[in-house]
Regions:
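Basic nucleic-acid-binding interfaces
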Residues: 1-191
């Protein structure tokens, strides 16, 4: 991510995300965005994750995103805001009454970079807690943690163990073989 979002860009994305969630929970059509109304950086393809947390206790209420850019950033945020509210399989769909009690967090992702390493036991030392988001792949299995997850799992070995579990594997899988590992960074902002 060479260019950072301006404060106006961030506000715009948060408004787009909230309005998309309101419309979706009220069964209204999600607005087709006219890209000419947005800054050039918001019109560029970008990858994002949208995270919903409860205001009362900060607990996760939904989180969906894309690891690679395939559509304009503003549309990516709009799409993933609705998906986080309605399609995160870990939670029931957000209701209209809940919306005012949720905070929206948006993470704009850099392009993932493949991490080269030759010994699984060296992997924890290559990760930068609080900085790197991590993608693990093993065959058809894949999982990611955003850099914000380091706040709950600051130890790299524990971080990797939880990520292996999320991938549907044993927690020590990362110690047993060379997995395909990519890292990325985020520009994170919230309401």
């Amino acid at each position: 991510m060479d260019e950072q979002l301006t404060s106006d860009d961030k506000k715009t994305l948060l408004v787009v995300a909230r309005q998309a969630i309101v419309n979706a929970t009220q069964k209204k059509k999600v607005v087709d965005l006219d890209l000419v109304n947005f800054s050039s950086i918001l019109r560029e393809n970008g990858a994002s994750f949208v995270t919903l947390n409860r205001k009362s206790d900060g607990q996760l209420r939904g989180c969906i995103g894309a690891l690679e850019a395939y559509q304009p950033l503003v549309q990516d945020v709009q799409y993933h805001a609705v998906a986080a509210a309605l399609e995160d399989y870990r939670f029931p769909p957000v209701t209209t009454n809940e919306i005012q009690n949720l905070t929206i967090e948006i993470s704009r992702l850099s392009a993932p970079v493949n991490l080269k390493y030759d010994n699984p036991l060296n992997l924890p030392g290559l990760l930068r807690p609080g900085v790197d988001g991590v993608i693990l792949r093993d065959g058809f299995k894949k999982a990611t943690f955003l850099p914000q997850v380091w706040e709950q799992l600051p130890d790299p070995e524990e971080f990797l163990a939880h990520l292996c579990r999320k991938m549907g594997d044993r927690p020590d899988r990362w110690k047993m073989k060379l997995l395909d590992v990519s890292i990325y960074q985020v520009e994170e902002f919230h309401e």
